Structure formats: C-alpha cells, structure tokens
Regions:
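A structural signal for short, well-ordered beta-strand segments
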Residues: 9, 60-66, 138
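Conserved helix-loop-beta segment at the catalytic/binding core of cyclic-nucleotide signaling proteins
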Residues: 1-19
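TPR-repeat structural position
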Residues: 23, 172-173
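Allosteric regulatory "coupling" segments in signal-transduction proteins
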Residues: 23, 80-85, 124
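Alpha-helical scaffold within the catalytic cores of cyclic-nucleotide enzymes
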Residues: 15, 19-62, 87-100, 120
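Cytosolic regulatory/linker segments at or just downstream of nucleotide-handling modules
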Residues: 69, 98-168, 180-187
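Active-site loop/short helix in cyclic nucleotide turnover domains
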Residues: 13-17, 68-78
Length: 187
C-alpha cells in the first residue's frame, strides 16, 4: 500500500522488489478485497440492526493498470514518500472511476490483461481517456481460473464478444439481441 487519499487506496507491485507476476498479484489482491466486502457488509448490517441504525453498505471500485512509472523517494529532505508517478498511474485512477460507469467491480487496462494468467475477463469498451490522444481498451475481471474453465462463462464470453462487435459496428438490434442472450446465459 502506497497511500490513502480520501476514500482511495493506492498500491503498487514490482517495486522495490522485482515481481514477475505483479499483474496477477494486483488482480488477486483486488479479487480478495471484493470477496471480503460481502461478509464485511453483513457484519456492519448486523451491528446497525442491533443498534437500530440505518445500514449503509460499503461499495468499492478498483482500477488496475500496468506500465512504466517513475518510482522512488519523492519529496524533499524534510519530507518524502516512496511512491509512483506517471501516465500509467493516472490511468489506473481513471479506470477505478469507470468501475461505477460500467457497473463492475474491477476494471483493468490492456497492459494488465496482457500479463495476466488464468483470470476470467471480459472486454468492456474502447475508452477515450482525458489527457490521452489514443483510446484505451478496458476490461473487467469476472473471476479466477475456476470461472475461466466453466463452460457457462466461455459461452457468455463468446456472446459478449459478438455483442461488442455489433455495438462497434452500430448494429444496434444485433447488439441488443446478444445482450439479452448474455443475460439469459448468466441466469
């Protein structure tokens, strides 16, 4: 963990110690956080109910990106912090914001996807990010190896790919049909 900024937690992998599986470790940490959220909310709800308070569930969105950054002690002689800076750090923050837009828990960039092993992912969109000249392809993490190996997920992914192709080609009826089919496959 690098720092807490309001309701944001910033963390990074692969520094100061090399970690060849840093993309996997980042995504696995994100998945572990999401897995812990449901029981945590159940605990908070039980406490709120026992005290007669309104229950307000905790919800989080996570953005991960992989890339080249500036890492090291930042600041002055009087005050410094070991941290990371750079475009790829900023993109991770923007991806976190997209989790709410797309209604998913974990959003990752294409560079992170390229380094993952055994994770179930779905492409979300080609997104024009403020401050970038080229759009970036974004994906969501649906689960781990267990989900990736399920026939139901593989069918859903194929339907999802067809839906995205129809959407990109502005074939709206076809895109909606694929979307409906995907919803039925998830049920």
């Amino acid at each position: 963990i690098d720092e807490y900024m309001g309701d944001c937690i910033m963390a990074f992998w692969n520094a100061p110690v090399d970690d060849k599986s840093h993309a996997d470790h980042g995504v696995e940490s994100a998945m572990a956080m999401m897995a812990r959220l449901k029981p945590l909310n159940e605990e908070i709800k039980a406490e709120a109910d026992a005290e007669g308070r309104k229950f307000i569930p905790l919800a989080i969105g996570i953005g991960l990106n992989t890339g080249v950054v500036c890492v090291g002690n930042m600041g002055s002689d009087q005050r410094f912090d070991y941290s990371v800076l750079g475009d790829d750090v900023n993109l991770a923050a923007r991806l976190e914001g997209q989790s709410k837009t797309y209604g998913v828990d974990i959003v990752i960039g294409a560079n992170t996807l390229a380094q993952l092993t055994d994770k179930a992912t779905l492409e979300l969109d080609l997104l024009q990010v403020r401050g970038k000249t080229k759009p970036v392809r974004i994906h969501c993490v649906a689960g781990g190896k267990d989900l990736l190996e399920r026939e139901k997920f593989l069918q859903l992914r194929e339907t999802h790919i067809k839906m995205l192709a129809a959407y990109a080609g502005q074939r709206w009826d076809e895109a909606f049909e694929s979307l409906d089919k995907g919803r039925k496959e998830m049920a």
